[in-house]
């Protein structure tokens, strides 16, 4: 991976479209069930790429680690000749400092998107799904042919965040308040709302319905 120009989306969406691929972003608020949806789509046999796994891939690149550490002013950890982000220190910093959070995101979000789209371009199959938590906040909507918005009742999604991340409900609500408001947003005619208000089999059926709609419209 390049260690410079990380903020540039290097033509990967165009490459994917030219090769006949249909790119679908899977998004939604915190705790909505995006990762669960991605797991189900993978079980259907479709190529899927997540922001978290892409970020972990980037963390193996010393140049990326140095760039991020320098951007937020947190010294990287060096171990056995490799550089590692001090993720705990950075997490504590950006949770309380909105300016530091924006600095971090100005580096990490474009890099994650570029790497994810490169991976999607190289994937087998003509229908590829990418989990993009900050699709609208980051201005990435136009990079995808279709969007799945996963929606879940607030009580259930905040409970999921408390259980998953060890945060309080108040912290979960605070994070949600900073994100795009999906509650009354259904998107454009190539946006499919997937209601996650039941069990896994119900979510699976709704995802199948969304896929059938994509196949008809693409």
Language model region names:
Residues 1-22:
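Extreme N-terminal, non-catalytic leader segments
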Residues 26:
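Hydrophobic anchor at the beta1->P-loop junction of P-loop NTPases
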Residues 32:
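ATP-binding Walker
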Residues 35:
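Walker A/P-loop
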Residues 46-61:
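Short beta-strand-centered segment that lines the nucleotide-binding/catalytic pocket of NTP-utilizing
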Residues 57-124:
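ATP-dependent small-molecule kinase phosphotransfer cores
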Residues 115, 142-143, 163-217:
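Small-molecule kinase domains that catalyze NTP-dependent phosphoryl transfer to phosphate-bearing small molecules
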Residues 115-122, 127-160:
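ATP-dependent NMP and nucleoside kinases share a basic, alpha-helical "lid"
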């Amino acid at each position: 991976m390049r260690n410079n120009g990380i903020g540039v989306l290097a033509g990967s969406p165009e490459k994917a479209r030219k090769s006949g691929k249909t790119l679908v972003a899977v998004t939604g608020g915190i705790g909505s069930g995006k990762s669960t949806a991605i797991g189900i789509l993978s079980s259907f046999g479709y190529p899927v790429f997540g922001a978290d796994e892409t970020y972990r891939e980037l963390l193996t690149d010393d140049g990326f680690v140095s760039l991020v550490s320098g951007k937020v002013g947190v010294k990287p950890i060096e171990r056995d000749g490799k550089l590692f982000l001090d993720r705990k220190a950075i997490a504590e910093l950006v949770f309380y400092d909105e300016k530091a959070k924006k600095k971090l995101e100005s580096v990490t979000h474009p890099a994650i998107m570029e790497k994810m789209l490169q991976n999607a371009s190289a994937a087998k199959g003509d229908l590829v799904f990418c989990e993009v938590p900050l699709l609208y906040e980051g201005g990435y909507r136009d990079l995808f042919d279709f969007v799945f918005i996963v929606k879940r009742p607030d009580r259930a999604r905040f409970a999921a965040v408390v259980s998953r991340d060890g945060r309080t409900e108040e912290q979960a609500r605070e994070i949600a308040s900073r994100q795009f408001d999906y509650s009354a947003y259904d998107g454009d005619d190539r946006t499919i709302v997937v209601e996650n208000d039941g069990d896994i089999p119900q979510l699976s059926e709704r995802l199948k319905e969304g896929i059938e709609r994509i196949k008809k419209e693409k």
